[in-house]
Amino acid sequence: LAGNKFLSIKGMLNGTSNFIISQMENGMSFDESLSFAQENGYAEADPVYDIEGIDAAHKIAILSNIIFGSPLPPDNFLIEGISKITKEDIHIAEKLGFTVKHISSADIRDGKILMRSNPALVKKTDYLSSLKNVRNALVIDTDLVGKIHISSIGAGGEATAAGVISDIVHLASGLKSFNAQSREDLDYRDLTDEFFSYLVTVHSTNENTNNHIQKILEEHNISIINSGLINNVKQSYITYYYEI
């Protein structure tokens, strides 16, 4: 990797979040999935860092610093967790050909880094979509060897212990980053300069109301990628998926 230029890093960096989402895919509610994760030792008694995306955000910030030589992220670094995801969101994503994943990413745009850590829709055909339960994964895109996929168990006592021991050995050895001499120190892009799309679901049993909402959205150039009946309720799905 030392001879490569890094273009982006993206992945699922919190095993607890992925475990909870996997249980919700099997029909559990968010609260039930969180309790199940805690019972199995995959979530802390106070799970806020896991379920609000903070743990994953810390990890992508560290990875960005190692790979891109970037300083600490700015205040407008997008951080969102999974606590507001519902079973309905999971179901709708599945109907549209996606899975819901908590994705953390840092990629270079116009010589600056765009960083975020948030739930996203991932195509079912994507590598990350197939990884369930407590697995973490990272996709590193480079100019010479292309995309590199790394995956491992990301939650639980043994996985955590292995990570801590690895960090201690790394620090004790005084090892430097493999690209410390060749990397460029890059700054961050301002999120206010970026355009993002979102998934919005409109719940209505009134056809006229739903059509009126769709008309307003279309008048503002917000595209509809699908609409239909789910559980006898009219749904509209507004464009948003996270391109891995």
Where are these regions (language model features)?
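A conserved regulatory-domain signal marking ACT and ACT-like small-molecule sensing domains
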Residues: 168-244
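ATP-dependent carboxylate/acyl-activation modules
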Residues: 127-197, 201
